[in-house]
């Protein structure tokens, strides 16, 4: 597809589990709002050709999504961003260069849609990534780092992800990093013939909550160590068996760390939470799953502790990928079609074509009525040319203020809805109007029909 110059230039930089090891992903990870805001502000200050920007940082990827100003060169923006990353994260540009994937225009849109649809995830079909992208978009939008361009892109990405889930069934098995970890833990317990199905879970964020739900489904009991007991009380209201879950403040970690054979750790802490100086010898073997990036557990010095990181779970994930190959093929077809539909939709929402259509509609309507008047001899034929000029001036005058208002509002976030409403009102393009009506700019999602 040949893109017209007035359309937004989309741009992505991606570092993922496919191109970068856990140790380097730890360095890139951003786990606090303050750090994320500071990083986005640095980009805004040093990259004047980047119009809008957002960052997606998860355990398996660090990605920058942006729209570029007209005439900006993607390779120059890539170099500038890698330099910022290198300085910010104390890494070398050459190391980053080896691991980064840059995508521009259609490729960038296709990449964002694929990520949001969980086709690029370590565990294909997991649904957590869509929520993570919504949170990343919402933060950038509320902090005014992104506006119309990325709003359009992300809304369509969420719509695409929903379509992939609904039409392929790729997420029906509910597989995620957390479920793979719990499944592996269950396998270990069966091999080790461990009958006491109890687990210690450190953290109460989204990943930790998923772990707890999977543990309960496998008939485990869980002790949660966290900082916010009120959050725990709200969480257990969602559970079918809340009595199997208990809570202690994380300050009591030393009292429990050597009591459990099974441990899951998933917090947003940038430092080790479980450290070697906390450990004591035990007569039983221990199995620990560190699902955080950066890692939360220091590499154990004791021989009877077996530690699994996110990357260690990859071999267990491959079977999941192979089993879902047919669904993936269909999903990629949906993503490819969505990419084309996105650009068609964007073009339909441009203000200039709408103004042209309104003027043409006015001209056709005026000409139609003039021909009726001539046919019924309400006006002499020799006046036709002069009447055409009068009508032309009349509808130009009538459309003057709406034209100025449309151009003025063209760069605002709500312009898509405005253009769609006008198209619907004048019956110019019902398909694009329906898209705009379903768009909810503030919840960053589409309403289901």
Curated annotation (Swiss-Prot):
GO terms for biological process: protoporphyrinogen IX biosynthetic process. InterPro entries: 4pyrrol_synth_GluRdtase, 4pyrrol_synth_GluRdtase_dimer, 4pyrrol_synth_GluRdtase_N, GluRdtase_CS, GluRdtase_dimer_dom_sf, GluRdtase_N_sf, NAD(P)-bd_dom_sf, Shikm_DH/Glu-tRNA_Rdtase. Transmembrane segments: none annotated. GO terms for molecular function: glutamyl-tRNA reductase activity; NADP binding. NADP(+) binds at residues 203-208. It catalyses: (S)-4-amino-5-oxopentanoate + tRNA(Glu) + NADP(+) = L-glutamyl-tRNA(Glu) + NADPH + H(+). The active site is at 59 (nucleophile). Pathway: Porphyrin-containing compound metabolism; protoporphyrin-IX biosynthesis; 5-aminolevulinate from L-glutamyl-tRNA(Glu): step 1/2. The record marks 111 as: Important for activity. Its EC number is 1.2.1.70. Pfam families: GlutR_dimer, GlutR_N, Shikimate_DH. It comes from the Bacteria. During catalysis, the active site Cys acts as a nucleophile attacking the alpha-carbonyl group of tRNA-bound glutamate with the formation of a thioester intermediate between enzyme and glutamate, and the concomitant release of tRNA(Glu). The thioester intermediate is finally reduced by direct hydride transfer from NADPH, to form the product GSA. Belongs to the glutamyl-tRNA reductase family. Possesses an unusual extended V-shaped dimeric structure with each monomer consisting of three distinct domains arranged along a curved 'spinal' alpha-helix. The N-terminal catalytic domain specifically recognizes the glutamate moiety of the substrate. The second domain is the NADPH-binding domain, and the third C-terminal domain is responsible for dimerization. Homodimer. Catalyzes the NADPH-dependent reduction of glutamyl-tRNA(Glu) to glutamate 1-semialdehyde (GSA). This is Glutamyl-tRNA reductase. It comes from Helicobacter pylori (strain Shi470).
